[in-house]
Amino acid sequence: MSDSQDKWDRIYARGSHNAKVAAILSRHTDLVQTSGLSLDIACGQGTNALALAALGMEVDAWDISAVAIEQLKDAAHRQRLAVNARIVDITPDMFPDNHYDLILNCHYLDRSLTTAITSALKPGGLVMFQTFTANKLADIGPSHQDYLLQPDELLSMFKDFETESYCDESQNVDRNDPLCGRAYLVARKPTGT
C-alpha cells in the first residue's frame, strides 16, 4: 500500500469526507447529458459519481482509496445506480482515447493528466474541473503549491476547448460556500478533433 493510499484510506475510514455534490456539477447539471459515458477522477466516496449516474450517465469512478471505493460501491448498490468504481493510482496511460462524453475532476490536481484528459474526451465532450487556487484567501484545502491552481491556469490547461463557464472564487473567504478558495472550468472539446 502506498503512503497516499494509506492516508486517504484513513481519512475515509473516519466517515463522510464530503457528502455534497461539487458546486461545478450542481450549478451546471443542464450541460450534463442524460446518457453517455462519464469519468469521475479521484472520486473519493463518490458523491459526484452517484449524481452523474442519477442523471442517467454511465459512470466510471477512479480513486486510490480502497475504503472510499468500497463506500461508493455500497452507496451505488443502495441507490440502485450503476457505477463502475475502481481502485487505481491514476496515471496518464490509463485514459482511453475518445472514450468519454464527460470527465469530472474535483479537488485533485495532477497536471500530468491534462493531455490524457483532453485525449480521452470524445469530440464535443465536456470537462468539468474544480479545485483550490494558489491565491486563495481562506485557509482551506491543500497548502502545497503543487496542488493549487495558479491564476487562469485552468483556462490555459484547456485553451483549445470552448469555455462554457469559468469561475474563480479565490477571494471568497466564506467557508460555508462550496466555492470558497476555488476555481472551476466547464469546457467543451471542439468537434472535429
Regions found by a protein language model. Name each.
Residues 1-33, 35-44:
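Conserved class I S-adenosyl-L-methionine
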Residues 65-67:
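Conserved SAM/SAH-binding beta-strand->alpha-helix loop
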Residues 79-90:
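Conserved SAM-binding strand-loop segment of SAM-dependent methyltransferases
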Residues 95-102:
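A short acidic, Gly/Pro-enriched loop at the edge of an enzyme's catalytic core
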Residues 125-132:
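Conserved beta-strand signature within the Rossmann-like core of class I S-adenosyl-L-methionine
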Residues 172-193:
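Core SAM-dependent methyltransferase catalytic element
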